[in-house]
Amino acid sequence: KRQGLGRKLESLRWGFVPNWYRTVNAGPLLINARSETIAQKPAFANASRERRCLIPCSGFYEWSKDLEGNKTPWFIKRNDDAPLVFGGVWQEWVMKVR
């Protein structure tokens, strides 16, 4: 999070909760957004302009499916084991009380 001219490191929960959800379980948590459409999607538009972040990680999984439909996870990481960083967006979500 931006603090004045600096930055702030925080631990956050994975999964984007759109601000129109009445509860955290009102629908699926969104876990990815396409860079080509993020600014136009209602769930991400404001966050893509105002709440960007960097997400450090050691790697990530991609899944492949064979002809029988069996899925295989592939862990993608750097050869030198240095950290990777993803661009992300974040959202503060507060349950609306009626």
Model-based region annotation:
Residues K1-R52, K77-R78:
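Short, His- and charge-rich active-site/binding loops that engage polyanionic ligands
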